[in-house]
Amino acid sequence: MQFLVDAGLSEKPLVYAVEDSGSFIGYVIFHDYDEENMEIGWILKRDVWGRGYASILTKMLIAECRKLRKGAIIECDPRQAVTEHIAKKHGFKFSGKRDGCDVYKLEE
């Protein structure tokens, strides 16, 4: 998998395309959430769901947060139980609500 930085929509990209073996499989979200945290997330094509990509991307994004010495936040749409499951699986804990989403913060 590879981040395609050139696909960014601003000077400091917020959304990156993701590919595997040359095929587009979705996007990752990676941007400042506040001064101390980055928001991470993913939007994957339905035909790649259940193959572990979300977990792989989550690990990669957590590593990027650590390089920046920042925490990680995942905002979960309450209708997406899988997102909540992945957040909890990787050590995120519920920390509140924002704009109708459940907010999970990585506990280190």
Briefly describe each language-model feature range.
Residues 39, 52, 82:
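Residues that form or flank phosphate/diphosphate-binding pockets in enzymes
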Residues 48, 52-61:
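Conserved acetyl-CoA pyrophosphate-binding loop and the N-cap/start of the following alpha-helix
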Residues 1-47, 63-64, 68-71, 75, ...:
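GNAT-family acyltransferases
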Residues 55, 79-95:
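Conserved active-site alpha-helix within GNAT-family acetyltransferase domains
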